[in-house]
């Protein structure tokens, strides 16, 4: 079985080299709208997305993020001109999972319209710092939010990576209730 959605899900890859050209507003808005349609526990729509396109702020965020890597002088945002920080409501028991689903929607939507994207970890660590907390307050973000991830967006400046073969044992199928009973005894 095949369709456009399944093909996009199978072909999207993390992009780690970007052109300096900023993405178009209509592209950004389409990706962000897709993020707002991510499933959330009980439909709470609890995550928050913060869009950063200012070069100075991105450089500051990159330095904060790099401090938690093995290469503190590197650029964990790979030169991407747009960073979407996804935050989770820490008072919502599904908040972090909800934020992860937003990240997935952002990346899949980006691929579907020809943009590169990559999930950059360490958002929680960045915004747990005093500098990160100050930044969030400056943006008007409530104290209850914690970092989930940073979704970098831009036009790829590299060939599209090939998918690795799917590993054996990725899926465990239970076809009948008897098979399930045999497994659990």
Residue ranges and their predicted role:
Residues 54-59, 90-92, 157:
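Short, charged/polar surface micro-motifs in flexible loops or helix N-caps
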Residues 83-87, 151:
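Active-site-flanking beta-strand signature of metal-NTP-handling nucleotidyl enzymes
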Residues 13, 88-90:
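Short, histidine-centered active-site or binding-site loop motifs used for metal coordination
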Residues 136-160:
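A glycine-rich helix N-cap at a beta->alpha junction
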Residues 175-180:
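Conserved small/polar residues in nucleotide/adenosyl-binding loops
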Residues 35-36, 84, 91-135:
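Small-aliphatic-rich amphipathic alpha-helix that forms the alpha element of a beta-alpha
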Residues 1-82:
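N-terminal amphipathic, basic helical "cap/leader" segment at the start of enzyme domains
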């Amino acid at each position: 079985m095949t369709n456009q959605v399944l093909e996009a899900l199978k072909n999207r890859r993390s992009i780690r080299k970007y052109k300096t050209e900023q993405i178009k507003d209509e592209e950004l808005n389409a990706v962000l709208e897709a993020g707002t349609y991510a499933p959330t526990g009980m439909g709470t729509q609890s995550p928050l997305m913060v869009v950063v396109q200012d070069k100075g702020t991105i450089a500051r965020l990159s330095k904060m993020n790099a401090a938690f890597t093995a290469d503190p002088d590197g650029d964990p945002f790979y030169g991407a001109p747009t960073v979407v920080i996804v935050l989770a409501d820490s008072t919502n028991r599904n908040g972090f999972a909800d934020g992860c689903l937003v990240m997935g929607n952002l990346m899949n939507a980006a691929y579907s319209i020809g943009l590169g994207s990559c999930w950059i970890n360490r958002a929680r660590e960045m915004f747990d710092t005093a500098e990160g907390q100050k930044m969030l307050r400056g943006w008007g973000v409530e104290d209850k939010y914690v970092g989930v991830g940073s979704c970098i967006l831009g036009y790829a400046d590299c060939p599209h990576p090939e998918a690795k073969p799917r590993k054996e044992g990725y899926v465990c199928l239970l076809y009948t209730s008897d098979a399930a009973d045999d497994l659990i005894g």
